[in-house]
């Protein structure tokens, strides 16, 4: 009887010596934070990581910004930029929504960490913010973990709303994922959407490009790629042979009626193909503000 061959784990990516030296220099400039919470789901492919900075100083940022995280890995110190998923109002906790990339330079090490582990980070950066968008109606489009900056923004508005500060925004969020067990933060976002009767103007639409009941798909989740769902909502064509199916009780027209082009900004984060594909229909709608954010290194 012979044993079945065991799969060979992906080889760690080669590191350029100059890059490695630069990374070590950067490491010395980075502050430290402790991992206080780790929640992994979707078969271990997605995770929410919460860090608490070791400094006693208040770590302030604008919702929608990103920071650089770094860890020592088998090939040396590796830094990568990640959008912050937590709200600046989250009591000093920095939260991240991260996808595991097999064979990636950093994410396998991130997912191997447990509470108590030390991460390094830099000060926040970026202009992917509500202030930059500068419009009352915000159409947010995300694929996968590109949802992170939108969670930060929507959660911040909700916390202010709960504190008696009414939101000046109407937000429409489209979140696309391949499978329905990959919708991070769904329960939280559905709770906000249910609060429309309380004056919180938020619409949330999930869409699965590979709808499979065994992976959590239910009719309340739209079918189709998120960029094609947005195209359908905007009354623009999608490629021949492709299809979009809206959830029961939701029509493209009912969502389109919420969008006033003159006072609307689109914001997209995630797959570069999705971001590129939306340029034409957004321009056709007459919307001039289109903010994008892309991070694809692993």
Predicted segments, located by residue:
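A short, basic/flexible loop-to-alpha-helix module at the beginning of a structural domain
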Residues: 124-134
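Reductase modules of NAD(P)H-dependent flavoproteins
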Residues: 2-9, 13, 20, 26-31, ...
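Ser/Thr-glycine-rich phosphate-binding loops at phosphate-binding pockets of nucleotides
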Residues: 143-149
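Structural motif
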Residues: 137-139, 170-172, 265
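Histidine-anchored nucleotide/phosphate-binding helix
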Residues: 84, 151-162
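Generic structural signal for buried aliphatic residues
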Residues: 67, 119-122
């Amino acid at each position: 009887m012979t044993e079945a061959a065991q799969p060979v784990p992906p080889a760690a990516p080669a590191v350029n010596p100059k890059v490695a030296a630069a990374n070590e220099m950067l490491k010395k400039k980075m502050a430290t934070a402790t991992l206080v919470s780790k929640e992994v789901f979707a078969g271990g492919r997605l995770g929410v990581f919460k860090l608490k900075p070791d400094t006693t100083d208040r770590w302030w940022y604008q919702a929608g910004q990103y920071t650089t995280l770094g860890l020592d890995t088998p090939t040396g110190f590796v830094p990568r930029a990640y959008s912050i998923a937590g709200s600046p109002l989250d009591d000093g906790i920095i939260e991240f929504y991260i996808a595991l990339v097999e064979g990636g330079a950093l994410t396998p090490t991130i997912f191997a960490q447990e509470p108590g582990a030390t991460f390094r980070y830099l000060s926040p950066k970026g202009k992917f913010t509500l202030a930059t968008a500068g419009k009352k109606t915000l159409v947010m489009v995300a694929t996968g973990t590109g949802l992170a900056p939108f969670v930060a923004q929507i959660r911040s508005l909700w916390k202010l709303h709960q504190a008696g500060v009414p939101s000046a925004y109407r937000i429409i969020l489209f979140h696309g994922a391949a499978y329905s067990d990959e919708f991070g933060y769904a329960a939280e976002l559905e709770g906000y959407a249910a609060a429309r009767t309380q004056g919180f103007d938020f619409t949330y639409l999930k869409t699965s490009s590979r709808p499979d009941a065994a992976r959590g798909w239910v009719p309340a989740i739209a079918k189709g790629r998120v960029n094609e769902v947005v195209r359908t909502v905007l009354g623009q064509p999608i490629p021949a042979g492709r299809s979009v199916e809206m959830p029961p009780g939701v029509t493209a027209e009912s969502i389109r009626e919420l969008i006033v082009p003159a006072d609307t900004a689109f914001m997209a984060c995630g797959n570069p193909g999705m971001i590129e594909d939306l340029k034409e229909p957004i321009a056709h709608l007459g919307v001039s503000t289109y903010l994008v954010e892309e991070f694809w290194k692993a």
